[in-house]
A protein has these predicted regions:
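Bacterial N-terminal signal peptides that target proteins for export
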Residues: 3-13
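N-terminal signal peptide c-region/cleavage motif recognized by signal peptidases
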Residues: 22-25
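Catalytic glycan-binding domains that act on GlcNAc-containing polysaccharides
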Residues: 27-153
Length: 153
């Protein structure tokens, strides 16, 4: 399983140029820099941006539970207390490049918990297993649509 994930990430990395073009409106260099800084896959970040906001840096969404998702990566307001310790406010979340860096940080936290797995990718959205698994499959579907992953067998 881990070897398959590593092979998939290598294939995804080789095809980076295609995704770079697909995610251009969200400052591609921010994705690359944030991913490098947090040691996460930039293509996964780009797919998350597409899933979350279709690369709209001004996106905001009020959830049924009263929380709010902010920016291109739809960072949830439940993270604001932790982010405030680093001087990050709600307004900061609406700055596209900073939003991507915060998303990379959040994804890294999930990878530290779950490893370099699809569970970690899904946990970016939710740690509830059914929601986590559904989300990771949505990210896989985006990568397949961008021809960055092989079709399901």
């Amino acid at each position: 399983m881990v070897l398959d994930m590593m092979k998939m990430f290598l294939r995804v990395f080789v095809a980076a140029f295609g995704a770079l073009l697909a995610a251009a409106p969200a400052h591609a260099d921010c994705f690359d820099e944030a991913a490098k800084y947090q040691k996460v896959n930039p293509l996964i970040l780009r797919a998350i941006a597409w899933q979350e906001s279709h690369n709209r840096p001004d996106a905001q969404h009020k959830n049924a539970n009263g929380s709010i998702d902010y920016g291109v990566m739809q960072i949830n307001s439940v993270h604001l207390p932790v982010l405030a310790q680093y001087g990050i406010s709600q307004g900061t979340l609406m700055e596209p490049c900073k939003n991507v860096y915060i998303a990379a940080w959040h994804l890294r936290r999930q990878m530290n918990k779950y490893g370099n797995t699809w569970q970690a990718v899904g946990a970016y959205h939710s740690e509830t297993p059914s929601l986590r698994d559904k989300y990771s499959q949505q990210i896989v579907a985006i990568l397949r649509k961008w021809n960055l992953m092989p079709a399901a067998r």
